[in-house]
Amino acid sequence: MSTVIHAGSRVLAPAADFLSPYDFFRDLTNPALAFLPRALLIAVVAALVCGSVGVHVVLRGMAFIGDAVAHSVFPGLAIAFVCGGSLVLGGALAGVVTAVLVALLAQNRRLKEDSVIGVLFVGAFALGVAIIARAPGYAGSLQDFLFGSITGIPASDVPVVMGGALFVLLMLFLAHRPIVAVTLDRESARAAGVHVLLADLSLYVAVALAVVISVQTIGNVLVLALLVTPAATARLLCDRLWTMMILSPALGASGGLVGLYLSWSLDVPTGATIVLVLTACFVLAWVFAPRHGVLARRLREKRG
């Protein structure tokens, strides 16, 4: 059902007709819709951070970790919800604890990272469901956790999200060299004196915090797309690492902006719309990328 809000002489009914960018800007500045600019800020910041972290996740071939961490933060979100605390802080605490456990357990080379992650995230998600089931009316809250809620972001979470985003970006900047070295060749990096455990821990914590920042806007189920799709698209469009690290967050932030605009105009779920926009960008890059697209490869094959 669409929500109709009267604002001055205009009736805001996003589902009634498609809003122009100008009307969307008016809605952003409408005091009666204070949640909308807040949601836009969180969506863009979350996409930017996930795009930055996702570069390392894609290069290391660890797409599964995003889904795993999204599930592993669920107990923290559930406890914070039941206790009436900050969902961002609760999820961040659970995510960091899980990141530390994964980093420590993954040092045992008899167990691959995906095995360790799979064991931990299933147990953590089950624990979160058990905890939130104790809360009255938990079904609606569970849906918000799984698929996001554009109206469910309190103003008190904005400074926490902004602080977390700055922390993640700073940590990625400071740990860039060791993380890349471990990604390219773990054993060579270890032999060169790189602290492999610290590099792994930095990446896992960055992923956990990026997921927590994103989960309220895009939801627990779809957060993997925000983490992987912009980076995968950038990977198709460029060859240099630094270019990829600039393009990926730019694509993510643009997808967050366009996705929120379309979801508000069409009255459809925000998280799903953002993911569809990013997926469309990936498909276009997969087909039309100048060097690595399908058409470019076919042309080279014909010329060869």
Residue spans of the language-model regions?
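Hydrophobic alpha-helical transmembrane segments
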Residues: 40-44, 88-93, 115-119, 158-163, ...
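Membrane-interfacial amphipathic/re-entrant helices at transmembrane-helix boundaries
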Residues: 1-47, 303
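Cytosolic-side transmembrane-helix boundaries in multi-pass membrane proteins
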Residues: 3-14, 268-304
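Membrane-interface helix termini and inter-helical loops of multi-pass transporters
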Residues: 21-32, 137-153, 261-264
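Short loop segments and helix-boundary regions at transmembrane helix junctions
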Residues: 55-138, 234-248, 261-270, 290
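Helix-loop-helix "hairpin" substructures at the membrane interface of multi-pass membrane proteins
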Residues: 46, 157-230
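Loop-to-helix entry region at the N-terminal start of transmembrane alpha-helices
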Residues: 34-42, 142-169
